[in-house]
Amino acid sequence: MSKSLNIIWQYIRAFVLIYACLYAGIFIASLLPITIPGSIIGMLILFVLLALQILPAKWVNPGCYVLIRYMALLFVPIGVGVMQYFDLLRAQFGPVVVSCAISTLVVFVVVSWSSHLIHGERNVVGQKGSKK
């Protein structure tokens, strides 16, 4: 009986911590003059707490495991909502594809530039110099 209570306590603690970060993010988002989703701010709060080891990862692990395990099921309502706007998406297919392609290329360029800026140019292992 004690072991099952301990497992239940771990799940309750995990979900309380996850939801506390979510609601803290929603509260902070309501105070900001710009529109940022509260769930994104809540994820950042949870990330900072975990990265700084203020919050042990083992405390939120059971809840995160459950959410990740059933993540596909959580996307079903979103897919149904998108299907309601199928005609609009079909009419705007070209601009959507072009904007996705351009934004992907911009991300590639920015990441490669920033990686080169941070890490610098590195020599290939085993290569002493460029042969002409």
Curated annotation (Swiss-Prot):
Keywords: Cell inner membrane, Cell membrane, Membrane, Transmembrane, Transmembrane helix. InterPro entries: LrgA/CidA, Uncharacterised_UPF0299. Its main location: membrane. The keyword Membrane applies. GO terms for cellular component: plasma membrane. Belongs to the UPF0299 family. This is UPF0299 membrane protein YohJ. The gene is yohJ.
